[in-house]
UniProtKB/Swiss-Prot annotation:
Organism from which the protein derives: Homo sapiens
Key word Glycoprotein present: yes
Keyword Repeat: yes
Designated name of the protein: Chordin
Role, per record: Dorsalizing factor. Key developmental protein that dorsalizes early vertebrate embryonic tissues by binding to ventralizing TGF-beta family bone morphogenetic proteins (BMPs) and sequestering them in latent complexes.
Compositional bias (Polar residues): 125-138
Post-translational modification: Cleaved by tolloid proteases; cleavage participates in dorsoventral patterning during early development.
Record InterPro entries: Chordin (IPR016353), Chordin-like_regulators (IPR052278), CHRD (IPR010895), VWF_dom (IPR001007)
Biological process according to GO: BMP signaling pathway; dorsal/ventral pattern formation; floor plate development; negative regulation of BMP signaling pathway; negative regulation of cell migration; negative regulation of osteoblast differentiation; positive regulation of cell adhesion; positive regulation of mesenchymal cell proliferation
Gene (name only): CHRD
UniProt subunit comment: Interacts with TWSG1 and/or BMP4.
Residue ranges, compositional bias (Basic and acidic residues): 143-168, 938-955
Length: 955
């Protein structure tokens, strides 16, 4: 049975509903039974408002189009919503996901030949624009277009930004000024599903302390601590944005403010507006006031180059330049100047009204010198009111700053002539303010020596390529090339920020290119691993034995202060939808037994997540640089891509760091030692020191468990000290649950009890390699690692699985297939019983049996007859089947006149009957019954478990 994880339940159900309306083409084989596995998706936090769907969390009243993965993709005609609980919209709690088909709600197009646009459900007429896309005449920003050329958003390969925009990605911008400050800031916000990712640049402002989002009335909706990553740049993410805030954002009523120490209520602020110019912006400028100080005056400019000529299109937004008393004029003349070192190069006149926040214009036919000054950041833009020459704002034009990361995965499938050698490449790039490009390229597994590394455009033909930079620095036998491309040019910088460039690696055997990758920007995710370390290259040549795969990938991995593993995996060249499910595993050195942790099973080429309960053995492998990240696919179930991971850490058992780690960087295979340098200390987080559990050394998680003198995070699993071999404990939200290991009967007459195992095993036949005096290397195919109880099993071993949080599953038996290393779990086949009242001999038995002496013999029959419960839970205690007891009700103690009994998993309680004469004279009159009578009283009062517990709470 395949060991691949199943898709999330909501996506699976939705896919079945969508496919169920299609006519069946024929009776096919029955679908295989899903393997027993532990729950991988995090449980919803108690009291949290929202919905969980497909591994993502959505706020109440939020709507989205479900993504079913390959080959279905995003279902644009299906709209899902997170509805509030039925018991009241004001009650906090998990919501309910409701999905419906919106295709019947599409309006009828008025034209004769409507078109179905990509990413839309309803058909629209050509040249039709919705009302939300119409802009005032003064703000109409025209994209550079030509009949023979595609627009920038459609040119080249689709990058990360375009893929994100196709999944609900929308850009907003805000000009931030203040009535009591000369500072000016610019905020760019991207809405990706239910998260806001923002990049904020500022001028003439002290270091901000917080980023504040509020409504038009000033009510604070969200605050984020400000930790500048570069000079004058702040990055952050607002996750799970509430529905009300999303409505304010789309209505352009959501405001952003920068809070400083001198202005705790906000020094500069402004509303977020949506504009289509953001999709093409590659250069920008922040305009501040010149001359005498005046507060609340400033502007920002969004610029882009034309696709067909050296013309600069721009949109300029300003505030405070026009006084309110000038509002009576219909048009106000403004003068725009382009300067270089104080020398006037160009001048434009623009007439705007006082009600419009800006205007759009074009600077045509830039000279070669002006293009060079543009990329160097030496062109200055100035704006002034012709009626008041003294009021003037200006700023230098430079390449757009962003918190996103420029990266590329190089693989053989994307080469000009596709090759399949198992090689891989990984690149990280940084564009400087002067137009220079810093590159760090890792290459592994090439068939021959690397002879050329180039940054180039998409070729029109195979022999017509425009090379922008010849990269150097890869020494013979080395894996990493680090250098600078000094002459990228304005056109090259523009194409780089538009995701239109490619990296090509040529070797002796493949001079035209053995590896090629698309350079794309990854949206900011909130973690610093991308900026602090190099990614880990993933190649088929690193798999043992090597796999000649045409795919490749790279991954960022890091450990935070809680020893939680953050990972992000990007792949390329997998071959599309026919590849099926892709899985990522973290494991130890190849050829040695040990844990194999499934990080994620996913569709497509990207995966990210957090692992909070990493095994101590894997943490030690990470610290020693012996851990591996393995990517498996349908075509290569034993591994298609692999990368070696090194994360220096001092994490201990249970997921807690007892001492501050000296370095947390990830060092990739073949990367220089500088990649493993310690990341910068984050302000506000004190250095960790040895401390008692719950002490001030680290913030305490309210869901952790304290057991045997140690703290365990939620979801952690471990062997307790009192029984390290035959017990397994789990932390489930401050509650420790320990289950004993129940051994199945061995399949041999003379089992052997190994000293390091709980259950007896059958002796294996002695192999030639096991003879004394011969070295033995353990083959990973000789055993299996079961993720349920995280233990290594010998080949041929059979056991009952432990699946947290459910505990021991005695109605299932798992078998280790030594040839493939797979774990096969199946249900126990219970025999069909001919007796009328079967019994369960032991409470932990799975199958029932006929009583001794009934004369009935078992028959082969229904599978999985073990539907009976293990016992009853009453007042926090477990009672086995058929057991009787007297309940205890605080503060009165044991209620001896009430008897409870566990039957069919439900406790039934009743008061003792005092009506029978037998009750009198037996001592019960003084203990239970108020009086004895020979007359029969009404039927005994029967109360269930909830009623008694309610009575106990009331008393």
């Amino acid at each position: 049975m395949p060991s691949l994880p199943a898709p999330p339940a909501p996506l699976l159900l939705l896919g079945l509903l969508l496919l169920g309306s299609r006519p069946a083409r024929g009776a096919g084989p029955e679908p295989p039974v899903l393997p027993i596995r532990s729950e991988k998706e995090p449980l919803p936090v108690r009291g949290a408002a929202g919905c969980t769907f497909g591994g993502k969390v959505y706020a109440l009243d939020e709507t989205w189009h479900p993504d079913l993965g390959e080959p279905f993709g995003v279902m644009r005609c299906v709209l899902c919503a997170c509805e509030a609980p039925q018991w009241g919209r004001r009650t906090r709690g998990p919501g309910r996901v409701s999905c419906k088909n919106i295709k019947p709600e599409c309006p009828t197009p008025a034209c004769g030949q409507p078109r179905q646009l990509p990413g839309h459900c309803c058909q629209t007429c050509p040249q039709e624009r919705s009302s939300s896309e119409r802009q005032p005449s003064g703000l109409s920003f025209e994209y550079p277009r030509d009949p023979e050329h595609r627009s920038y958003s459609d040119r080249g390969e689709p990058g990360a930004e375009e893929r994100a925009r196709g999944d609900g990605h929308t850009d907003f911008v805000a000009l931030l000024t203040g009535p009591r400050s000369q500072a000016v800031a610019r905020a760019r916000v991207s809405l990706l599903r239910s998260s806001l990712r923002f990049s904020i640049s500022y001028r003439r402002l002290d270091r901000p302390t917080r980023i504040r989002f509020s409504d038009s009335n000033g009510s604070v909706l969200f605050e984020h601590p400000a930790a500048p990553t570069q000079d004058g740049l702040v990055c952050g993410v607002w996750r799970a944005v509430p529905r009300l805030s999303l409505r304010l954002l789309r209505a352009e009523q959501l405001h952003v403010a920068l809070v400083t120490l001198t202005h705790p209520s906000g020094e500069v602020w402004g509303p977020l507006i949506r504009h289509r110019a953001l999709a093409a912006e590659t250069f920008s400028a922040i305009l501040t006031l010149e001359g005498p100080p005046q507060q609340g005056v400033g502007g920002i400019t969004l610029l882009t180059l034309s696709d067909t000529e050296d013309s600069l299109h721009f949109l300029l937004l300003f505030r405070g330049l026009l006084e309110p008393r000038s509002g009576g004029l219909t048009q106000v003349p403004l003068r725009l100047q382009i300067l270089h070192q104080g020398q006037l190069l160009r001048e434009l006149q623009a007439n705007v009204s006082a009600q419009e926040p800006g205007f759009a214009e074009v600077l045509p036919n830039l000279t070669v010198q002006e293009m060079d000054w543009l990329v160097l950041g030496e062109l200055q833009m100035a704006l002034e009111w012709a009626g008041r020459p003294g009021l003037r704002i200006s700023g230098h034009i430079a390449a757009r700053k962003s918190c996103d990361v420029l990266q590329s995965v190089l693989c053989g499938a994307d080469a000009l002539i596709p090759v399949q050698t198992g090689a891989a490449g990984s690149a990280s790039l940084t564009l400087l303010g002067n137009g220079s490009l810093i590159y760090q390229v890792q290459v592994v597994g090439t068939s021959s020596e690397v002879v050329a590394m180039t940054l180039e455009t998409k070729p029109q033909r195979r022999d017509q390529r425009t090379v922008l930079c010849h990269m150097a620095g890869l020494q013979p036998g080395g894996h990493t090339a680090v250098g600078i491309c000094p002459g990228l040019g304005a056109r090259g910088a523009h194409m780089l920020l538009q995701n239109e460039l490619f990296l090509n690696v040529g070797t002796k055997d493949f001079p035209d290119g053995e590896l090629r990758g698309h350079v794309a920007a990854l949206p900011y995710c909130g973690h610093s691993a991308r900026h602090d370390t190099l990614p880990v290259p993933l190649a088929g040549a690193l798999v043992l034995p090597p796999v000649k795969s045409q795919a490749a990938g790279h991954a960022w991995l890091s450990l935070d202060t809680h020893c939680h593993l953050h990972y992000e995996v990007l792949l390329a060249g997998l071959g599309g939808s026919e590849q099926g499910t892709v899985t990522a595993h973290l494991l130890g050195p190849p050829g040695t037994p040990g844990p194999r942790r499934l990080l994620k099973g996913f569709y497509g080429s990207e995966a990210q997540g957090v692992v909070k309960d990493l095994e101590p053995e894997l943490l030690r492998h990470l610290a020693k640089g012996m851990a591996s990240l393995m990517i498996t696919t349908k075509g290569s179930p034993r591994g298609e891509l692999r990368g070696q991971v090194h994360i220096a850490n001092q994490c201990e058992v249970g997921g807690l760091r007892l001492e501050a780690a000296g370095a947390e960087g990830v060092r990739a295979l073949g990367a220089p030692d500088t990649a493993s340098a310690a990341p910068p200390v984050v302000p506000g987080l004190p250095a960790l020191a040895p401390a008692k559990p719950g002490g001030p050394g680290r913030p305490r998680d309210p869901n952790t468990c304290f057991f045997e003198g140690q703290q365990r995070p939620h979801g952690a699993r471990w062997a307790p000290n009192y029984d390290p071999l035959c017990s397994l404990c789990t932390c489930q939200r401050r509650t420790v649950i320990c289950d004993p290991v129940v051994c199945p009967p061995p399949s041999c007459p003379h089992p052997v009890q190994a000293p390091d195992q709980c259950c007896p095993v059958c002796p294996e036949k002695q192999d030639v390699r096991d003879l004394p005096g011969l070295p033995r290397s353990r083959d990973p195919g000789e055993g299996c690692y079961f993720d349920g109880d995280r233990s290594w099993r010998a080949a041929g071993t059979r056991w009952h699985p432990v699946v947290p949080p459910f505990g021991l599953i005695k109605c299932a038996v798992c078998t280790c297939k030594g040839g493939t290393g797979e774990v096969h779990c199946e249900k126990v086949q219970c025999p069909r019983l001919a007796c009328a009242q079967p019994v369960r001999v032991n409470p932990t038995d799975c199958c029932k049996q006929c009583p001794v002496g009934s004369g009935a013999h078992p028959q082969l029959g229904d599978p999985m007859q073990a539907d009976g419960p293990r016992g009853c839970r009453f007042a926090g205690q477990w009672f086995p089947e058929s057991q009787s007891w007297h309940p205890s009700v605080p503060p009165f103690g044991e209620m001896s006149c009430i008897t409870c009994r566990c039957g069919a998993g439900v406790p039934h309680c009743e008061r003792d009957d005092c009506s029978l004469p037998l009750s009198c004279g037996s001592g019960k009159e003084s203990r239970c019954c108020s009086r004895c009578t020979a007359h029969r009283r009404p039927a005994p009062e029967t109360r269930t478990d909830p009623e008694l517990e309610k009575e106990a709470e009331g008393s």
